[in-house]
Amino acid sequence: MFKQLILLALAAVFLLINISSAEPAAEPNANAEPLAEASAEPRIKIGLFDQLSKLG
């Protein structure tokens, strides 16, 4: 019975660590995606203008 209590306590600590570490990681990832998409568009446009200026 003593081993079961230790295992239960370890499982509770493990779950609390996972829950507390998962919440902050979700917010920056959600905020990083629109920034990555917004920064990709001007690079594509600049690349197109460079290609057109080389042709003309």
From Swiss-Prot:
The modification Leucine amide is found at residue 55. Its main location: secreted. Changing residue 47 to K: Complete loss of potency. Residues 23-42 form a propeptide. It is found in: Secreted. Changing residue 47 to P: Complete loss of potency. One of its GO terms (cellular component) is host cell presynaptic membrane. Inhibits sodium channels (Nav) inactivation. Shows two types of inhibitory activities on channels. Inhibition of hNav1.6/SCN8A shows a large increase in the steady-state current component without any increase in the slow component, whereas inhibition of hNav1.1/SCN1A, hNav1.2/SCN2A, hNav1.3/SCN3A and hNav1.7/SCN9A shows a large increase in the slow component with only a small steady-state component. Is 5-fold less potent than beta-PMTX for inducing repetitive action potentials in lobster neuromuscular junctions. This is Alpha-pompilidotoxin. It comes from Anoplius samariensis (Solitary wasp).
